[in-house]
């Protein structure tokens, strides 16, 4: 059985929880207090961060790596595209999410006021650029829920918490976010600590 060491407020852990619930398989989640991490976390992950996935003698960290492994191991429902070109494009989007969106979270959480404000603007502007996509399609890659939707959902859930206000032209993105938040796997994957992050 797979075991996920998951931070109860960690957006990257939330990604992995969403995938595990989407797959509907047997797994165990061990909640990790990010302010009082167990000693064995640093043994499993040299960066001493969550999430960490353990299956027999395999130990994985980094949410996108964990999620691709789970998707390959349990291919239904498939969350990464099957075709090599589409799969490569999906990976490129995941890379861009990390660099253009999630890279700003540390500055918002623990930077100076100036750094946090700059990071909020960067996230707001990037999300506003994405918004028109959802006028014509239901999810990131079209009509099917995919790993890209999994990757961005935790950030969208935390917009209020991070103090990020989107302009009116981002309305299609917010409708998309509500579609994500209404998925049964998303709801099941929420921790009690995450439920209070959104008004």
Give, region by region, the residue ranges found by the protein language model.
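GST-like domain detector, emphasizing the conserved glutathione-binding G-site
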Residues: 1-131
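Residue-level detector of family-conserved "landmark" positions at structurally sensitive sites
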Residues: 30, 63, 169, 190-191
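Carbohydrate-binding/catalytic loop surfaces
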Residues: 194-199
């Amino acid at each position: 059985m797979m075991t996920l060491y998951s931070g109860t407020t960690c957006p990257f852990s939330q990604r992995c929880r969403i995938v595990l619930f989407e797959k509907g398989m047997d797994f165990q989640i061990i909640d990790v207090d990010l302010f009082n991490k167990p000693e064995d976390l640093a043994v499993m992950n040299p960066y001493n961060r969550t999430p960490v996935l353990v299956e027999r003698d395999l130990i994985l960290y980094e949410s996108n790596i964990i999620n691709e492994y789970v998707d390959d191991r349990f291919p239904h429902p498939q969350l990464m595209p099957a075709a090599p070109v589409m799969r490569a494009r999906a990976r490129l989007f995941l890379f861009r999410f990390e660099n253009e969106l999630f890279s700003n979270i540390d500055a918002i959480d623990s930077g100076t006021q100036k750094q946090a404000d700059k990071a909020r603007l960067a996230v707001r502007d990037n999300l506003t650029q994405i918004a028109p996509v959802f006028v014509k399609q239901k999810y990131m890659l079209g009509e099917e829920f995919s790993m890209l939707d999994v990757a961005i959902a935790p950030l969208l859930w935390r917009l209020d918490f991070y103090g990020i206000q989107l302009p009116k032209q981002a309305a299609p993105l917010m409708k998309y976010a509500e579609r994500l938040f209404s998925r049964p796997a998303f709801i099941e994957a929420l921790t009690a600590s995450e439920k209070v992050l959104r008004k």
